[in-house]
């Protein structure tokens, strides 16, 4: 059960959140099979991805806005938007099939805090956010470079990384960061780059 999994990781949400997640699970399973949105479509796999998406809420600050780069099937950006309904969320995804899915979930769940952009992040104009997130898109240096156009002077970053993080950081030239490890995931939290 999702609620037990999240609460075991110090994440607590209202009942509405869990109801919305169950709708998301069903929609992802339906769309995912037809449109190849994700390779992991069992309920347990989706629950693990939801936990992976939300776990950083246990250690990051609260932000007024965020943009998720390459949201794909919804991780982490869509899940964060469901959990943080008073935070303005932007999902930036260039693939039309995935954008259609994200917009369908947005409409179904009435996510008024959410904007889905069908674009590559480097082509996005007139958007600046407090937090930039990304999971499994590209290396840290390139992510920092291609997101310059959407960052504020003091934006923070949250990248969901794997085992190659240490070597990526050597090339990225960042400071004021924190790495939080959970299983095979390394969460890279970079506070307020200027």
From Swiss-Prot:
Localization, per the record, is: Cytoplasm
The EC number(s) attached to this protein equal 2.1.1.170
Quick one: which residues bind S-adenosyl-L-methionine?
A: 70, 75, 121-122, 135
- Which reactions fall under this protein's catalytic activity? guanosine(527) in 16S rRNA + S-adenosyl-L-methionine = N(7)-methylguanosine(527) in 16S rRNA + S-adenosyl-L-homocysteine
Residue ranges of the TM segments: none
Q: Which GO terms describe its molecular function?
A: rRNA (guanine-N7-)-methyltransferase activity
List cystine links.
none
Q: Name one GO cellular component term.
A: cytosol
Q: Keywords of this protein's UniProt record, alphabetized?
A: Cytoplasm, Methyltransferase, rRNA processing, S-adenosyl-L-methionine, Transferase
Q: What does this protein do?
A: Specifically methylates the N7 position of guanine in position 527 of 16S rRNA.
User: Which family, according to UniProt?
Assistant: Belongs to the methyltransferase superfamily. RNA methyltransferase RsmG family.
Protein name as annotated: Ribosomal RNA small subunit methyltransferase G
Q: What is the lineage of its organism?
A: Bacteria, Pseudomonadati, Campylobacterota, Epsilonproteobacteria, Campylobacterales
